[in-house]
């Protein structure tokens, strides 16, 4: 009689723990030019990176800032500004640590936007100075 409840509980737990980071409630501060869909896509990419590099994909909060056109990118994977785009710096509280990312965004020829994510720092304790 208890077996169905145990199985149902196990299934519910597996479903909850397998949700991507972007499906969870995330606190956003700062400014971004990203649409809600692009913001979600970027967060999914960062969550994949966090999972691969640290074994955890939970993103609690994100602070976003648009960088000036004079910004010199760190190891750019794409020349966003020459493609009509821009750079942003996102600071995430992910998995109990802070990490900063350079986000390049530019218009896509297929419609919408393309982007590239470059880690600027490793994982740092939340109490560490920026």
Residue ranges and their predicted role:
Residues 1-8:
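Bacterial N-terminal signal peptides that target proteins for export
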Residues 4, 15, 86:
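Functionally constrained cores in energy, signaling, and assembly domains
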Residues 13-21:
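C-terminal segment of classical bacterial N-terminal signal peptides
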Residues 23-130:
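Cysteine-centric segments in proteins
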